[in-house]
UniProtKB/Swiss-Prot annotation:
Pathway noted in the entry: One-carbon metabolism; tetrahydrofolate interconversion
EC number(s) per entry: 6.3.4.3
Binding site for ATP: T68, P69, A70, G71, E72, G73, K74, T75
Taxonomic lineage: Bacteria, Pseudomonadati, Pseudomonadota, Alphaproteobacteria, Hyphomicrobiales
Molecular function as annotated in GO: ATP binding; formate-tetrahydrofolate ligase activity
Native species: Rhizobium etli (strain ATCC 51251 / DSM 11541 / JCM 21823 / NBRC 15573 / CFN 42)
Catalysed reactions listed for this entry: (6S)-5,6,7,8-tetrahydrofolate + formate + ATP = (6R)-10-formyltetrahydrofolate + ADP + phosphate
Record's protein name: Formate--tetrahydrofolate ligase
Keywords: ATP-binding, Ligase, Nucleotide-binding, One-carbon metabolism
Annotated GO biological process: tetrahydrofolate interconversion
Enzyme class name: ligase
Length: 559
């Protein structure tokens, strides 16, 4: 039996086309690309601005059920579907997020797809790529440095150091940095205060980069960032400290979308990378809107399950950017359905149709939720070799009872040839005119009501709890004019509830909001629930322990 190649072996063996050829497929002239080597480039802001009058293509969202810790192949399916659409004669472009080093060296792995449905150069994309995350981290931490420097030199803005909300960031999972005291060591080092680090993908600067439409909008949003409060409790903005201009300079190149290619030499934009459990979970508006002007079909993904990524895609990204999705694909795997049915991780490779049927309640909830936004749905069963015919048949039967269709997809093993059926179905749905997109809630209800609507309608919670300080903070923001903003829920990705161990489709649970953060520049309010952390930690045995350079100088263990 031939050995199965790893993702990195498949990617390394790929025949990549020069990036100028990929750009030419989209009508992008060589002089409008800023190359980073031979296989990746940024698309110039001038070219993007010139596309404004063109008609938009069809927008397809790929989302998923609540995942296992390894993920269910959402990015793999996004890439595979893009290749599949091109295979059947449609001009399709893939739009995905950039990879964070945290999960690369943690447990989940990279974010370039898998098997024969990958974007390349996989190693570059999963590591430093074009330096966007470095630029975002630098811009974020420049503001942090300016805050402490301002206080050191006399604190002209009367910033209350007890009420500074701006933390530092780094692109790594490091629980030791969550909470700390800075400026220790005497008078020369400033005024000691409590602070900490978040992971870069949770940074408001990341969200701003992904929601800004151009450099002018970027700088305006950066200036709107609230870093804390004065002694009179009025907000202090980044522009009050004259930080917005320098931050925009650091982000100037990062604002330009990155163009790469799939293994089948089809175009892909990889740009921005907020997590969906602690941020809004979507690639950049700039990349998505550019792709819509250049392709007939744009396939994009939103992080984790549809309760997180898809809800934020609809309620934040589409609302803010004026996007109207034409169809949605919900990725399900037999193993994740069995886990939602109560099967232990070590037993997921054993057939268990009864547990799978029980776990299908999770899939059913996600189908209903996406339909709630007025978007037609098809289910993609991402095939694993351990799946049995009986298990696949059970999923298809369950979905058919919902009035939808579940299609077995084998793009991981077969590339575009393994996903043609799904591609045809997506075209059928997108061309049908069924989509009647609308957000879940309006702008004018209170912030707490928005949280309650998401919790009750999407999570099926029975109650939302928050202490008086949280409720008062929300009311204060409403009085300051921020009441019309959407809400970004920070919640575990493993359950509809705030308990990662509560699988399936729980009803009547309690969603506890322990903290709220105002992202005035990004334009949303973050509600932090349960035990979710904005700086993750590494697992007991992180992937980093198995990543190394071999004798030939090639990377091993990256996936």
């Amino acid at each position: 039996m031939p050995s199965i190649k790893s993702d990195i072996e498949i990617a390394r063996a790929a025949t990549k086309r020069p990036i100028f050829e990929i750009g030419a497929k989209l009508g992008i002239a060589a002089e409008q690309l800023v190359p980073y080597g031979h296989d990746k480039a940024k698309v110039s802001a001038e070219f993007i601005a010139a596309q404004a009058g063109k008609k938009d293509g069809k927008l397809i969202l790929v989302t998923a059920i609540n995942p296992t810790p390894a993920g269910e192949g959402k990015t793999t399916t996004t890439v595979g579907l893009g290749d599949g659409l091109n295979r059947i004669g449609k001009k399709a472009i893939v739009c995905i997020r950039e990879a964070s080093l945290g999960p690369c060296f943690g447990v989940k792995g990279g974010a370039a797809g898998g098997g024969y449905a990958q974007v390349v150069p996989m190693e570059d994309i999963n590591l430093h790529f074009t330096g966007d995350f470095h630029a975002i981290t630098s811009a974020h931490n420049l503001l942090a440095a300016i805050i402490d420097n301002h206080i050191y030199w006399g604190n002209e803005e009367n910033i209350d150091i007890r009420r500074i909300t701006w933390r530092r960031v780094m692109d790594m999972n490091d629980r030791a940095l969550r909470s700390m005291i800075s400026s220790l060591g005497g008078v020369a080092n400033g005024f000691p205060r409590q602070g900490g680090f978040d992971i870069t993908v949770a940074s408001e600067v990341m969200a701003i980069l992904c929601l800004a439409t151009d450099l002018k909008d970027l700088e305006r949003r950066l200036g709107d960032i609230i870093i804390g409060y004065r002694f009179d409790k009025t907000p202090v903005h980044a522009r009050d400290l004259k930080a917005d201009g320098a931050m925009a300079v650091l982000l100037k190149d990062a604002m330009q979308p990155n163009l790469v290619q799939t293994l089948e030499s089809n175009p892909a934009f990889v740009h921005g990378g907020p997590f969906a459990n602690i941020a809004h979970g979507c690639n950049s508006v700039t990349a998505t809107k550019t792709a819509l002007k250049l392709g007939e079909y744009v396939v994009t993904e939103a992080g984790f399950g549809a309760d997180l990524g898809a809800e934020k895609f609809f309620d934040i990204k589409c609302r803010k950017a004026g996007l109207r999705p034409d169809a949605a694909v919900i990725v399900a795997t037999v193993r994740a359905l069995k886990m939602n049915g109560g099967v232990k991780k070590e037993d997921l490779g054993t057939e268990d149709v009864a547990a799978l049927k029980k776990g299908c309640a999770n899939l059913g909830r996600h189908v209903a939720n996406v339909r709630r936004f007025g978007v037609p749905v098809v289910v993609a069963i991402n095939h694993f070799v351990s799946d049995t015919d009986a298990e696949i048949a059970a999923v298809k039967e369950f979905v058919s009872r919902l009035g939808a269709e579940a299609i077995l997809c084998q793009h991981w093993a077969k590339g575009s040839a393994g996903i043609e059926e799904l591609a045809h179905k997506v075209v059928e749905l997108a061309e049908s005119g069924q989509a009647k997109f609308q957000p879940l809630y309006g702008d004018d209800i209170s912030l707490f009501e928005k949280i309650e609507i998401i919790a009750s309608k999407i999570y099926h919670a029975g109650e939302v709890t928050a202490d008086k300080a949280v409720r008062d903070q929300l009311q204060s923001w409403e009085e300051q004019g921020y009441g019309k903003l959407p809400v970004c829920m920070a919640k575990t990705q493993y359950s509809f509830s705030t308990d990662p161990n509560l699988r399936g489709a729980p009803e009547g649970h309690i969603v506890s909001v322990r903290e709220v953060r105002l992202s005035a520049g990004a334009g949303f309010v973050v509600a932090i629930t349960g035990e979710i952390m904005t700086m993750p930690g590494l697992p007991k045995s992180p992937s980093a322990e198995r990543i190394f350079l071999n004798d030939q100088g090639y990377i091993e263990g990256l996936f």
